[in-house]
């Protein structure tokens, strides 16, 4: 109820001439008397009285007043009626749920509600429907305090009533036995549900068990959407019913009123008369909806689709309000908030999801066991940005290819078409079922069936979808759109099935329009980027660290110095997809170099300042405009930001005007002013202040308003003129010579005040609305009619304003491609500036690229570890090349904790950084372009595929041997440790030999098997494979022991080991495992036993080697020099 408090003096009604003139803002306030809550047992009290004929109420009031005047002379009746009137109104007011909301605007689900809305201006208030004309006849009668005689009389009547009843509170006790009073609380301070009123009233369905009209509505909608948690609009609250109420109470920490939880009328709940329920206030809907979606639920908003004034003017005035499911949201489709879901607040604290929905389908498996092959099709869409990724590939029994794509895309929701094979299903469950997985949060999984004719149906549905789009968008770009359509129709069968399923799926959420943007379809398998498989992403910590799966400590965290959300998303793509195109790569590096070298110049400062001023996510907002979900303040922010950017670079007409030497920078800057004229043309049509305040009635400037808006505003003005003219008519009936003055009390307008001494002149047809001890206030029948007509115009005006705004958004959407390209260039500039910031760090250098496959780094460092270490990182050199007479593989040995894994990760990360276009942490770097990096690091089993640690190890190794090529980098860490020493050494030696001889790729092989050093002797000295180790120093009894002498005595327990973290030539003959045990604080008695056993085992090994050498010597003496080489190798190993 809109208006001023009762204590405020009555305000004279404004004249019509002041209606269209600008006025100072006036803050509307709620009535001081909130409506009483209804009994929780009856969910449809509001609907049961919705259709009551208002004329009957007016007639009843008129007859009561006439009787009072006849019996009491016009004064006493006015004194006695208020208490009864107040009680009846208190019960009825909430029953009319349509009057609980002050305006139709309060039903909006825009994200602006979460930030608070500005108070509308007085002029806008004139257009807003407040329902005051309907409430006028039902308002409380305001009275002066009762005198002492009246109070005493009422006390006496109450005593007689109690005596007749038998004892105090007996009526309340009776009611409590039928319907227990339940209190509702909300930890957030929201409006509470009150206990049932202590008055026994007849409630529909309370005893008969019959469902009320609103309950039938809820059940009907719920049965059609059983997988959806429904939030139902009921008057001034949103409510949850049944099992949905219990779920919402748990997630939102609100109270659930007990009742029926099932929607199938199960006999076990036949004794219950009403549904369980929980409620939230209207203004908190966006907050709670976001929390439910973030918790993984699919929610639906059920709204009243008709308004009070138009309902009373329609044919269904006696029926309940019509309710429909208007919005459905899940994690991937929640775009009604510009900030989306803040996944950093997830319970797991994991990395933020990318917002992709990913659809998977696959064919039946071919082959058995390790020979199993399946064909998989995927399609992922990011509704917030419009990006679509698709792929079709064959996968082995380990499902490594699918895992790679899932880790790259990091979806927040999966749609599975048809049945999956057991291995695929287990992989999906493993990645989606844990809140501590690499995605940082649980993934919502939805499944749909797959018929035998799915392929044909999908092709037909996709073709029809795009044919309809082409028909609806006949334009000058039709040839281009036709070309894009042909691209979509050429997709493979599995991808087409996914696309069809995704179109159907997104239609439920009203987001199917994202597939119109076929320009942004990308193939995952396009070999224009380096391939980083799932193991590589995890082992090298590209997106998240391996400790707690957060971004801190990852490569992306190291590079992310972006200033915008859309720039951050683009950088994430760059990090996961390093370039293979040498020309594009050199252009990107040149742009970074120029930005770094000109860091404090005006042109670079202008770019930084422009990006700092972008405070909204333009890419998300543009998609929300395209979907028609953008709010007015958000639209104003987008248009003004784009205008500001265009004005900053208005002088740039061609790329050469940008003033940079880099082609990439000039092209990006030159695209920014291209949208200036388009944006200004839209800004010229809107009222900026009204848009900022989310004022729909004044959003458009007057000469740009639609005809419907103008007609309804004129209609409201005409009604105001009629009301003004009615002042003299009312005065004539009161026998006055001057026009009456309208007053507004408690939000009820156009009241005529009459002193109680003059009530004899008031016509019987006038309806008394409120009064005091000295004054009575009335509405004439004509005023009631005019107000009802005005309210109908106001609600129609509201609908017309929404329709005009929707059309306005559609007009902007026609320029989507141009605006999107501008935002993409702005994101590119943000990423380049981020890389330039990293390049400015101490010790970073510009990499140079060669046509050969090589990695030549001097003074290289680990990019993440050096930022996390409190001390300086020890640099190392690396030289690998596939060219003849060069080393292409390193066999790396060294003590435990000596830095072997950090070194090989450093080499891989430097290569990735270079191909992203970044500077690298080294003194100098000369690199060839790698087409893939493959890693096999760590030890873990795979319960979801029932594989042991060693099986996982060998399966991943087999996948690497099949996938790696001459331009790849392979990293193998301690291969063979999952089995016995002899088997492990044999497998490790065979794999190493294969990689070096057959694959001929760059390789870093870490091992603790010193015997593998002999493999290098199978190649020419100093070529192909070279033995290196991590340097260390050992001190025994204060005397330094060299690596060569380390194994002469086995007293390693008494040695002090110092790690140098430098790479040196040769083999580390010992691993110093007992030193690590001592650092781990293993008990001394255990260490003593281990040291003794270690010496014993090593002595036995030496004895066996000596015996073997003596046999070799005998063979050499008997058979000549044929086995002389083997003898030399054995002596060296000994």
Curated annotation (Swiss-Prot):
Subcellular location(s) per record: Nucleus
Bias type Low complexity, positions: 21-40
Compositionally biased residues, Polar residues: 1-18
UniProt-listed PANTHER family: DNA MISMATCH REPAIR PROTEIN MSH3, DNA MISMATCH REPAIR PROTEIN MUTS FAMILY MEMBER
Subunit structure: Heterodimer consisting of msh2-msh3 (MutS beta). Forms a ternary complex with MutL alpha (mlh1-pms1).
Function: Component of the post-replicative DNA mismatch repair system (MMR). Heterodimerizes with msh2 to form MutS beta, which binds to DNA mismatches thereby initiating DNA repair. Msh3 provides substrate-binding and substrate specificity to the complex. When bound, the MutS beta heterodimer bends the DNA helix and shields approximately 20 base pairs. Acts mainly to repair insertion-deletion loops (IDLs) from 2 to 13 nucleotides in size, but can also repair base-base and single insertion-deletion mismatches that occur during replication.
Protein name: DNA mismatch repair protein msh3
């Amino acid at each position: 109820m809109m208006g001023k408090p009762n204590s405020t003096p009555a305000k004279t009604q404004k004249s019509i001439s002041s209606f269209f003139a600008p006025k100072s803002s006036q803050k509307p306030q709620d009535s001081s008397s909130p409506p009483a809550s209804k009994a929780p047992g009856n969910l449809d009290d509001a609907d049961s009285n919705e259709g009551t004929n208002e004329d009957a109420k007016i007639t009843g009031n008129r007859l009561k007043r006439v009787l009072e005047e006849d019996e009491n002379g016009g004064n006493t009746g006015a004194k006695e009626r208020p208490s009864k009137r107040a009680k009846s109104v208190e019960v009825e007011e909430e029953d009319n749920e349509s009057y609980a909301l002050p305006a139709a605007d309060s039903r909006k689900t825009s994200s602006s509600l979460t930030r608070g809305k500005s108070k509308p201006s007085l002029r806008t208030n004139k257009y807003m429907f407040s329902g005051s004309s309907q409430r006028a006849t039902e308002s409380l009668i305001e009275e002066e305090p009762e005198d002492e005689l009246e109070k005493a009389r009422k006390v006496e009547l109450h005593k007689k009533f109690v005596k007749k009843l038998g004892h105090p509170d007996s009526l309340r006790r009776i009611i409590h036995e039928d319907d227990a009073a339940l209190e509702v609380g909300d930890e957030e301070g929201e409006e509470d549900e009150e206990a049932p009123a202590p008055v026994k009233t007849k409630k529909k369905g309370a005893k008969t068990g019959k469902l009320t009209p609103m309950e039938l509505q809820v059940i009907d909608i719920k049965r059609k959407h059983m997988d959806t948690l429904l939030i139902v609009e009921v008057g001034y609250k949103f409510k949850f019913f049944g099992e949905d109420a219990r779920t919402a109470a748990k997630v939102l920490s609100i109270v659930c009123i007990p009742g029926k939880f099932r929607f199938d009328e199960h006999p076990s709940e036949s004794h219950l008369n009403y549904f369980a329920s929980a409620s939230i206030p209207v203004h908190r809907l966006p907050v709670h909806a976001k929390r439910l979606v973030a918790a993984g639920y699919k929610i639906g908003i059920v709204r009243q689709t008709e308004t009070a004034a138009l309902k009373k003017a329609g044919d269904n005035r006696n029926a309940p309000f019509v309710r429909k499911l208007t919005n459905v949201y899940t994690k991937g489709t929640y775009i009604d908030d510009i900030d989306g879901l803040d996944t950093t607040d997830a319970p797991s604290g994991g990395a933020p999801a990318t917002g992709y929905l990913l659809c998977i389908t696959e064919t039946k498996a071919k082959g058995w066991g390790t020979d199993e092959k399946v064909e998989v099709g995927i399609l992922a869409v990011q509704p917030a940005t419009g990006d679509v990724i698709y792929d079709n590939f064959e996968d082995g029994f380990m499902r490594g290819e699918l895992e790679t794509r899932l880790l790259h895309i990091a979806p927040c929701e999966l749609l599975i078409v048809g049945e999956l094979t057991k291995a695929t299903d287990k992989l999906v469950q493993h990645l989606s079922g844990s809140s501590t997985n690499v995605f940082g949060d649980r993934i919502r999984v939805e499944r749909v069936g797959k018929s035998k004719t799915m392929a044909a149906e999908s092709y037909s549905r996709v073709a029809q979808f795009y044919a309809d789009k082409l028909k609806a968008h006949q334009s000058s770009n039709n040839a281009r759109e036709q070309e894009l359509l042909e691209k979509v129709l050429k997709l493979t069968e599995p991808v087409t099935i996914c696309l069809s399923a995704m179109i159907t799926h997104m239609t439920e959420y009203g987001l199917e329009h994202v597939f119109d943007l076929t320009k942004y379809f990308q193939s995952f398998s396009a070999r224009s980027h380096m391939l980083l498989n799932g193991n590589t992403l995890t082992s090298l910590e590209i997106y998240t660290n391996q400790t707690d799966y957060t971004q801190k400590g990852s490569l992306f965290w190291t590079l992310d110095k972006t200033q915008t959300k859309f720039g951050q998303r683009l950088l994430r793509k760059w990090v996961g997809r390093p370039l293979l195109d040498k020309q594009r790569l050199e252009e990107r590096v040149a742009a970074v170099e120029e930005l770094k070298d000109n860091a404090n110049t005006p042109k670079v400062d202008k770019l930084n300042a422009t990006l700092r001023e972008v405070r909204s996510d333009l890419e998300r907002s543009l998609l929300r405009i395209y979907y028609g979900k953008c709010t007015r303040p958000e639209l104003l922010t987008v248009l003004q930001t784009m205008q500001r950017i265009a004005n900053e670079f208005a002088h740039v007409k061609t790329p050469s005007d940008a003033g940079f030497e880099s082609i990439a920078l000039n092209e990006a800057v030159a695209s920014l002013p291209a949208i200036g004229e388009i944006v200004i043309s839209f800004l010229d049509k809107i009222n900026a202040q009204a848009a900022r305040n989310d004022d729909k009635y004044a959003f458009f400037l007057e000469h740009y308003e639609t005809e419907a808006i103008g007609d309804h505003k004129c209609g409201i003005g005409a009604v105001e003129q009629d009301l003004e003219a009615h002042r003299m008519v009312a005065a004539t009936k009161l026998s006055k010579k001057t026009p009456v003055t309208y007053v507004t009390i408690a939000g009820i307008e156009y009241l005529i005040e009459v002193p109680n001494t003059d009530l004899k002149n008031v016509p019987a047809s006038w309806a008394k609305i409120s009064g005091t001890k000295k004054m009575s206030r009335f509405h004439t029948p004509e005023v009631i009619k005019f107000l009802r007509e005005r309210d109908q115009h106001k609600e129609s005006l509201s609908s017309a304003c929404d329709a005009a705004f929707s059309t306005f958004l559609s007009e902007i959407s026609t320029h989507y491609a141009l605006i999107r390209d501008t935002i993409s260039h702005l994101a590119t500039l943000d990423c380049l500036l981020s890389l330039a910031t990293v390049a400015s760090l101490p010790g970073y250098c510009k990499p140079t690229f060669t046509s050969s496959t090589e990695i030549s780094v001097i003074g290289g460092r680990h990019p993440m570890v050096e930022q996390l270490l409190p001390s300086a990182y020890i640099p190392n050199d690396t030289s690998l090349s596939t060219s003849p007479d060069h080393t292409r593989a390193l066999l790396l040995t060294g003590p435990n904790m000596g830095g072997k894994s950090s070194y090989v990760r450093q080499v891989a990360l430097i290569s990735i950084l270079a191909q992203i276009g970044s500077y690298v942490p080294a003194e100098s770097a000369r690199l060839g372009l790698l087409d893939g990096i493959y890693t096999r690091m760590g030890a873990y089993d795979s319960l979801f595929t029932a594989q042991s640690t060693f099986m996982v190890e060998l399966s991943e190794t087999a996948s690497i041997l099949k996938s790696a090529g001459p331009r790849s980098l392979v990293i193998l860490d301690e291969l063979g440790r999952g089995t016995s020493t002899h088997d492990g050494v044999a497998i490790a030696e065979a794999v190493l030999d294969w990689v070096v001889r057959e694959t001929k790729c760059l390789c870093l092989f870490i091992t603790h098997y010193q015997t593998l050093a002999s493999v290098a002797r199978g190649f020419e000295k100093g070529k192909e494979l070279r033995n290196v180790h991590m340097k260390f120093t050992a001190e025994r009894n204060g005397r330094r022991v060299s690596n060569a002498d380390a194994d002469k005595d086995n007293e390693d327990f008494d040695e002090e080991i110092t790690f140098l973290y430098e790479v040196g030539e040769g083999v580390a003959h010992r691993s110093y495992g007992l030193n690590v045990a001592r650092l781990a604080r293993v008990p001394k008695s255990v260490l003593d036993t281990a040291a003794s056993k270690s010496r014993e085992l090593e002595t036995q090994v030496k004895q066996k080697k000596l015996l073997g050498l003596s046999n070799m010597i005998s063979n050499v003496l008997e058979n000549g020099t044929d086995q002389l080489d083997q003898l030399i190798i054995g002596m060296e190993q000994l």
